Amino acid sequence: MDPKGTTVLDFIEEQAECSQSDSEQGSEENCSDISDLIDNAEYEQGNSAELFAQQQAFDFHKDICTTKRNLKRSLRNAFQCITSQSNTPASRSAPKRRLLDDSGYNEDISTEVVQVDENGGSEGYGSLTSQHLSGVCLNQGDNGGVDKENVDCTALLRAGSRRAAYLGVFKEKFTISFTALTRIFKNDKTCCRNWVGTVYRAREELLEASKTILQKCCDFILLLTHTCKYGFLALFLLEFKTAKSRETVQRLFEHILQVEKEDMLLEPPKLKSLPAATFWWKIQHSNNSFKWGTLPDWIARQTMISHQIADDEPFSLSVMVQWAYDHNYTEESTIAYHYAKLASEDSNAAAFLKCNNQVKHVKECAQMTRYYKTAEMTEMSMGQWIKKCIGEIEGVGDWKQICKFLKFQNVNFLSFMSALKDLLHRVPKRNCMVICGPPNTGKSMFVMSFMKALQGKVLSFVNSKSHFWLQPLRGAKVAVLDDATRATWTYFDTYLRNGLDGTPVSLDMKHRAPLQICFPPLVITTNVNVMQDPAYFYLHSRIVCFEFPNTFPLDEAGNPLLLIDELSWKSFFERLWTQLDLTDAEEDEDGEPRSPFRCCPRSVATSL
């Protein structure tokens, strides 16, 4: 202030100046009805760190309880997982242990592990399982008791220790481990024909009875008995008639031997292990063993010298061709399928399956078989061919059905026999027989049964646009063309007059030069009466025609009253063999003049 003093006006101006915040604060204080809304009192600093620690401990305890509940539900699965780790190689067990360690459960109970007595189980197989189970399963409760979870773990631990003890006894008695003779099936429902079973605590009289009872369902039984600290120890090698699962075999042993499933060790044998096969072959000659049935192939193949020599035998194509020829197989798919099925019986078929070029062998086998069959058929006379064909037809027929049918169609039987004789002997100008008539008169049934009996070939005019549609005539003794239309007869009248005569013609072959052949006996069915059509005048002298005017007779159910099939033609040729003049001059009265065809060298046994 001015030392000289302050005037009244200056004082009023100075006191009248105020800030906006002061006015707003005053208005708010005037408008509020709540007293002491804001506590501006000072407080002392409390123990906030202890409160935070309590909250963290509560959350941690809650998470631990949740984890324990989840582990309690899947306790048995955890035990199976740990057991599988102990049975698998070390390279696979490490990742599974990491999965269990990641759960956090192991760290939580690390201070509550109960030490398992090392003398309670055997070394090797059972020790790892016991250590895992002691760390995971044996957890004491807060009140000092053992809950249901721990009771289950103890039972599982005892079962694992029992299995380990049984494995130790097995190795002590047989000087070889059980796992060296068997392979592991993890699933009890996996089926197999061969099973290895070790049974403990069985009664002697039941073991003797099992030798007879098991013969009903087995092809091979090998039983070896020993005595051990658990009583009788029985080792079974069984080959069942049908594949069975572990559960089925367990129930079978429980029923026959009256033992618990915990007292059994069941696994399939190692089929490709030479030491295992040698073990089984050796114990079958021991004094306290029982054997019934034929030795399984997987043992004989690895232990017997003859089987080993057969396994080393190389593949021979000629043997395969001889097999296909004897069974009349000419198609690639049929040869490949049926020859592969012989691999378990024939050494050459087994060698065929080992080849990397099976397709090449199958094609060559089929081609060679067709070559041999065609050459054999060409060399045969018509009488020899008919005898061969009807000899392959099994059964007895009635030749009179053919005679009745010809009589029903008003066909002279002697005229038909004369025409059939000329047809089979391929007389010129009489090399083609035509059966004409309206539909549903039995033409196709009559001709097709004749073709099947003589193993003839079928021509289809639908392929006439191809140059090779007549190629089946190259390998046929008899040919049939069913339901020829006017277009077919026009084609014959234009291009195939010489073929109907029976004289040589040039036949176009696929992938080959044109071949000169004579048409085989040809039988044609048609609805066109060629003999009465002047448009085909030049064919009249080249065909022999029979007309079937009557509809084929049927009964009320629609079944034919006259049945003509391959058996009817077989009986027909046997009955009228002499009338058809089918006997060859060089054929002896003793029977077959030809020796069987062989395309591979005879074996020693066959030659002797």
UniProtKB/Swiss-Prot annotation:
The keyword Hydrolase applies. It catalyses: Couples ATP hydrolysis with the unwinding of duplex DNA by translocating in the 3'-5' direction; ATP + H2O = ADP + phosphate + H(+). Residues 411-561 form the SF3 helicase domain. Keywords: ATP-binding, DNA replication, DNA-binding, Early protein, Helicase, Host nucleus, Hydrolase, Isomerase, Nucleotide-binding, Phosphoprotein. Its EC number is 5.6.2.4. It is found in: Host nucleus. Can form hexamers. Interacts with E2 protein; this interaction increases E1 DNA binding specificity. Interacts with host DNA polymerase subunit POLA2. Interacts with host single stranded DNA-binding protein RPA1. Interacts with host TOP1; this interaction stimulates the enzymatic activity of TOP1. ATP-dependent DNA 3'-5' helicase required for initiation of viral DNA replication. It forms a complex with the viral E2 protein. The E1-E2 complex binds to the replication origin which contains binding sites for both proteins. During the initial step, a dimer of E1 interacts with a dimer of protein E2 leading to a complex that binds the viral origin of replication with high specificity. Then, a second dimer of E1 displaces the E2 dimer in an ATP-dependent manner to form the E1 tetramer. This is Replication protein E1. It comes from the Viruses. GO terms for biological process: DNA replication. One of its GO terms (molecular function) is ATP hydrolysis activity. Phosphorylated. Coiled coil: none annotated. ATP binds at G437, P438, P439, N440, T441, G442, K443, S444. Residues 145-312 are annotated as: DNA-binding region. One of its GO terms (cellular component) is host cell nucleus. The modification Phosphoserine is found at S74. Belongs to the papillomaviridae E1 protein family.
